[in-house]
Design a protein with these regions (language model features):
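Structured alpha/beta reader/binder surfaces that contact nucleic acids or chromatin modification marks
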Residues: 2, 6-126
Length: 126
């Protein structure tokens, strides 16, 4: 078991803490490709400034345990197969959830690396 650090915007972190967000979608690259079931992720509470720029925020705001990792080709494939509300609780449809991811990750990168549905379980609020 390894312990990782990663940031989440405040609203998504709140969704994780109350159990609405149980699946984290990421490209299958970098540290996310190294995640394993049983690993712990210490989450930072990141925030956007008035210009919309994302900044690292409060460290150790919450901890989650990785309980499953599923592989998909694209984010649309992921949100069609997973409960999209467990991925993006604020989304009103599968298409809206996929579009949110498409704003961050190009289709080229999705096709190159593939996508991970990282199922998480909230374990503590340090």
């Amino acid at each position: 078991m390894r312990v990782w650090e990663s940031g989440r915007e405040s609203n998504l972190l709140d969704d994780i803490i109350v159990g609405r967000k149980t699946i984290e979608g990421r490209l299958n690259r970098g540290k996310f490709a190294e995640y394993s079931v049983g690993d712990i992720v210490s989450l930072r509470r990141d925030y956007r400034d008035t210009k919309g720029i994302l900044h690292d925020g409060e460290p150790d705001a919450a901890q989650v345990k990785i309980v499953a990792i599923r592989h998909y080709k694209t984010f649309i494939d992921m949100v069609e197969s997973e409960n999209y509300k467990s991925v993006i609780p604020s989304a009103n449809s599968v298409k809206e959830a996929a579009t949110i991811y498409d704003n961050y990750y190009s289709m080229g990168d999705q096709n190159k690396y593939g996508v991970l549905a990282i199922e998480i379980e909230y374990i503590t609020e340090p």
